[in-house]
Amino acid sequence: MKSSAQLCMEARNYNFNAAAPLRLYLATCVRLVEEAQAAAQADDVARAYMLYVRYLDLCMHQLSGHREVQQPVTDAERLSRDEYEQLLRLEVPAVLRLTEELKSAVDLRHERGRASLARSVVPEAGRGEHSRQEVQLPPSFDEERFNRTVQWFLAAGRSMSLPVSAEEPAVREVFSYPELPKLSMAAESWAPS
């Protein structure tokens, strides 16, 4: 899980086009809040926090310098500016409160995750750093054949050219798996009776 600082950086990483109409960004703001609410209801605290921070950055930093907010020309632009100002008065304070609550939840989960990870990484007391565990191989294991196969793959990896001819006995031997059943594709086995 990411920390609140990492999520803030991620939230502020988006492209803002000042030439796009203000009404499109207002619709984007509504969509961001809807998605953040859905994420919060689904208990995806990190995503909800990131979306709310992106919403706040868009409303309070990016859109405040938008041309249609600064100098609206048409009636439609004035209407969009009024909607933006209403958004700042009514929604932004509520989203700020939600974001602060989510920030503490995100940081708490992040710290718990780090502590849990630290516990799982630290070796248990009394265990050697390089303890070995004996593994019992099956009786069908052929160590000589295994070593030949490993050597073949090492040689093939160095030359970067694997032999592809099925006629070569070494290749046939490497790619035959005796422990797997052999399937017969004879025509008589598929004929209807």
From Swiss-Prot:
- Which key words tag this protein in UniProt? Endosome, Protease inhibitor, Thiol protease inhibitor
Instruction: State whether keyword RNA-binding applies.
Output: no
Q: What is its main location?
A: other
Q: Where in the cell is it found?
A: Endosome
GO terms for cellular component: endosome
Source species, domain of life:
Eukaryota
Q: Name one GO molecular function term.
A: cysteine-type endopeptidase inhibitor activity
Q: Keyword check for Membrane, yes or no.
A: no
One BP term from GO: ubiquitin recycling
**Main role?**
Inhibitor of the DOA4 deubiquitinase involved in the regulation of protein degradation by the proteasome and maintenance of a normal level of free ubiquitin.
Its family? Belongs to the RFU1 family.
**Protein name per UniProt:** Regulator of free ubiquitin chains 1
Source organism of the structure: Eremothecium gossypii (strain ATCC 10895 / CBS 109.51 / FGSC 9923 / NRRL Y-1056) (Yeast)
